[in-house]
Amino acid sequence: MSIYTRPVMLLLCGLLLLTLAIAVLNTLVPLWLAQANLPTWQVGMVSSSYFTGNLVGTLFTGYLIKRIGFNRSYYLASLIFAAGCVGLGVMVGFWSWMSWRFIAGIGCAMIWVVVESALMCSGTSHNRGRLLAAYMMVYYMGTFLGQLLVSKVSGELLHVLPWVTGMILAGILPLLFTRIVNQQTQARHSSSISAMLKLRQARLGVNGCIISGIVLGSLYGLMPLYLKHQGMANASIGFWMAVLVSAGILGQWPMGRLADKFGRLLVLRVQVFVVILGSIAMLTQAAMAPALFILGAAGFTLYPVAMAWACEKVEHHQLVAMNQALLLSYTVGSLLGPSFAAMLMQNYSDNLLFIMIASVSFIYLLMLLRNVGQTPNPVAHI
């Protein structure tokens, strides 16, 4: 029986449309703010309000799923995201845009929690890696296509908002034709995010999501700046970023399959080691293409494998809470990593971007090498 059931395929189709909209807005909002002559610190504050919304949305979505189920939570999340999009055209100004991006951030985080939790609850310990790999492939493909859309269509605010809003609403349609069962509502005991974060046997998965956030946040946010400082033109920067993201897309399926077959612990060790090698290779600047490719293939696949590791260690009814904890951990890492790396780059050297990535990866590798007690029969086996 295929792991890609009808509900899973429809869920991923909806996610693709929503991710396209997210990618377009995340690229154009800072440009719209700059065109409005807002100072850089205000542009940064609007971006921060979006990520703050991500944190807030992550915290309460589990409760929402338990109360109204996956489908209705997904509809509500999409409508909140659409409202945050429409608001940008209704009210113009720093404070109003901060508010609307905060609302959009809540909606986006809710979408991620709902989709990831639904996929984990649909799978088993034997195929969850492949399900999460498919999720990440769709997510990165949507991000990639969103960047292409930005380069091909008009970037005017009032030209973009109508079709982006329509795309968000179209993302609701696939789930109108299926129902995703929430087995958590039948559980006697609910789990909290804090309890999942404290769970000793899942700590490597939580730490892996933090490290993944640091690595990806730093690469996404600061790699273009690093390349710019190397004297590259915008077209060249776009090419190398495409290489990085493409490697992440291509690496998802093999890593997910290997993790299901040989175990997540072994695959995580190999991934982290390859991230370290890729970072060191970037410092030499001798072979940027293979260095960026292996860095993208290993770095962009850390998150789903770490998620699958953590989800092996909990009961089935705890999967939604665990997913919230993992997404929260990733978000914290993606906020801290670029901030710290940017400070190092500004005050010392651009090369410290890769030294930092290699250093945090090495610390995580030591944690993985210390763990020799991988559970042969995972708890979440159903």
UniProtKB/Swiss-Prot annotation:
- For this UniProt entry, what is the primary localization, expressed as one broad class? membrane
The UniProt keyword set, sorted, is: Cell inner membrane, Cell membrane, Membrane, Transmembrane, Transmembrane helix, Transport
Q: Where is the chain membrane-spanning?
A: 8-28, 45-65, 75-95, 102-122, 131-151, 157-177, 204-224, 231-251, 270-290, 291-311, 325-345, 349-369
Q: Which residues lie on this side of the membrane: Periplasmic?
A: 29-44, 96-101, 152-156, 225-230, 346-348
Q: Which branch of life, at top level?
A: Bacteria
This protein's GO cellular component annotations are:
plasma membrane
InterPro entries annotated for this entry? MFS, MFS_dom, MFS_trans_sf, MFS_YcaD, MFS_YcaD-like
- Family matches, as NCBIfam families: PRK03633.1
Q: What is this protein called?
A: Uncharacterized MFS-type transporter YcaD
Lineage runs:
Bacteria, Pseudomonadati, Pseudomonadota, Gammaproteobacteria, Enterobacterales
